[in-house]
Curated annotation (Swiss-Prot):
One Pfam family cited in the UniProt record for this chain: Arabinose_Iso_C
Family matches, as InterPro entries: Ara_Isoase_C, AraA_central, AraA_N, AraA_N_sf, Fuc/Ara_isomerase_C, Fucose_isomerase_N/cen_sf, Lara_isomerase
Name of protein: L-arabinose isomerase
Superkingdom field: Bacteria
Catalytic activity: beta-L-arabinopyranose = L-ribulose
Residues in coiled coil: none
Cofactor binding, note field: Binds 1 Mn(2+) ion per subunit.
Length: 501
């Protein structure tokens, strides 16, 4: 098990029935415990697996699934029917379950013992039809779940379970997430608006607005010794421009950036996991927060520019899902295109706020003018994103529901150096092509603010959408405009109906 999530756990619940007798049930318990321990030992799984005693009655099932729902440590449940477990016994428990569930369809052994198999073996190893009975009742009750079929010794199986666990972790983080919104939405912008009451009802996230001068007070309460220490950290970590170093003519700008970072950290320490800013509402701040935002994102905080709390929530959620994985996750915005026929690419960036977790090299720390915000020149980290497979994820409020849009991409090196671009950036090739990708994104109403991740897989995002009951449109190598339009029409009907199921 990875060491990053030490407080969270997944419960492993095995179903059977008393009909088999105590000897068989003892074997079921022994083998299911061994299977759970094998999962717990897998490096593919980011969360501890905790075996629970075999359940054989409706009351026992209800008790364990109620306990899972109320446990602050439990972020999800894996279920497995080692033998046949009559599924009517599961109705009350499944109806009470409020945590993500994975139905694992497996068996204890790998091979059939052809030479020795007898009815005792057949009586014990009945997952082939026990899980079918369980699958029926889940579908009959419209239980949202992920289903994984495979032996636990197969790395494909553990990888798939690990992916679901990460989705469950993201959903758990979102259920308790608090976002500090400094100022309001950028004036007249549509897609960054949204229903915060519905967001808290649907996802659990709490979004509240604070005056930017509440932040400014925290910023200007920072002491000089704190700033000195952080400036030294900058010089030890990044390629700091000479003009920003101690004795340089712009060193005061670096100190101001450090002051803003420390003030932000002090403010957010009061239980916040994400935040937003707005260049139209900077109050007494002397710089638009740039370096501070980048470093806070690198530490796992969610961020959205121009009051975009939905993207801020998704940055935090995806970062949680990606903890311990190679790659990174950042706030992002599509900026401009290279439309060279046959090699079309998208250049993504923002005014300042791109997370260095996606950097392909040591970032340089620089100061440059910024034409908006009417403040002093802000300091920022400058770099280009490392190449690799990734996903660009957006969230929008469709009025009747939230919609996630995910485009599978390949992050690539820029075609040439970018000596005059004073901000961090990423260049990517979208699937299946630039034209189909952008047509689909526009048809979906996808936002211009997004999350770029090279850590979290599309499969994990799909599991997250299932867990949270959120629409997800994936744009990948199989997408065509015609089929994508059809999917959106079907989804519109489904989600209107599902809201009442």
């Amino acid at each position: 098990m990875a060491e990053h999530f030490t407080d969270e756990e997944i419960w492993f619940v095995t179903g059977s029935q008393s009909l088999y007798g105590q000897e068989i049930l003892d074997q079921v318990a022994e083998q299911s415990r061994a299977l759970a321990e094998r999962l717990d030992a897998s490096a593919d799984l980011p969360v501890a697996v905790r075996w629970k005693p075999v359940v054989t009655t409706s009351e026992a099932i209800l008790d364990v699934l109620r306990d899972a729902s109320s446990s602050p440590q439990c972020v999800g449940v894996i279920t497995w029917m080692h033998t046949f477990s009559p599924a009517k016994m599961w109705i009350r428990g499944l109806s009470a379950l409020q945590k993500p569930m994975l139905h694992l369809h497996t068996q204890f052994g790998v091979e059939i013992p052809w030479d020795t198999i007898d009815m005792d073996f057949m009586n014990l190893n009945q997952a082939a039809h026990g899980d079918r009975e369980f699958g029926y009742i889940q579908t009959r009750l419209s239980v949202p779940r992920t289903t994984v079929a495979g032996h636990v010794g197969d790395p494909r199986t553990t990888a798939r379970i690990g992916s679901w666990m990460r989705a469950a972790l993201g959903a758990a983080e979102l259920r308790s997430l608090r976002i500090a919104r400094f100022g309001d939405n950028m004036r007249d912008v549509a897609v960054t608006e949204g229903d915060k009451v519905e967001a808290e009802s649907h996802f659990g996230v709490s979004v509240n607005t604070y005056s930017v001068n509440d932040l400014a007070k925290a910023v200007y309460d920072v002491s000089d010794p704190e700033i000195d220490k952080l400036v030294q950290e900058y010089e030890d970590t990044y390629a700091v421009a000479e003009e920003l170093r101690r004795g340089g003519e712009r060193h005061a700008s670096l100190r101001e950036g450090a002051r803003i970072e420390l003030g932000l950290r002090h403010f957010l320490a009061d239980g916040f996991g994400a935040f937003t800013t707005n260049f139209e509402d900077l109050g007494d701040l002397r710089q638009l927060p740039g370096l501070a935002v980048q470093r806070l994102m690198a530490d796992g905080f969610g961020f959205g520019a121009e009051g975009d709390w939905k993207t801020s929530a998704m940055v935090r959620t995806v970062k949680t899902m990606g903890v311990g994985l190679p790659g990174g996750t950042s706030f992002m915005e599509d900026y401009t295109y290279d439309l060279t026929p046959g090699s079309e690419r998208i250049l993504g960036a923002h005014m300042l706020e791109v997370c260095p977790s996606i950097a392909g090299q040591t970032p340089s720390l620089e100061v440059h003018p910024l034409g908006i915000g009417n403040r002093e020149d802000p300091v920022r980290l400058r770099f280009t994103a490392a190449p690799g497979s990734g996903v660009v994820l957006g969230i929008c409020d469709m009025g009747s529901r939230f919609r996630l849009v995910a485009n599978h991409v390949t992050v690539v090196e820029p075609s040439a150096p970018l000596p005059n671009l004073p901000v961090a950036c990423a260049v990517w090739e979208p699937e299946p092509s630039w034209s189909t990708s952008t047509e689909a994104w526009l048809m979906a109403g996808g936002p211009h603010h997004t999350v770029l991740t090279t850590a979290v897989s599309p499969t994990t995002l799909d599991d997250f959408a299932t867990i949270t009951g959120t629409e997800l449109l994936q744009i990948d190598q199989h997408t065509t405009p015609r089929e994508f339009q059809r999917e959106m029409r079907w989804n519109a009907v489904y989600h209107h109906i599902a809201a009442g199921l």
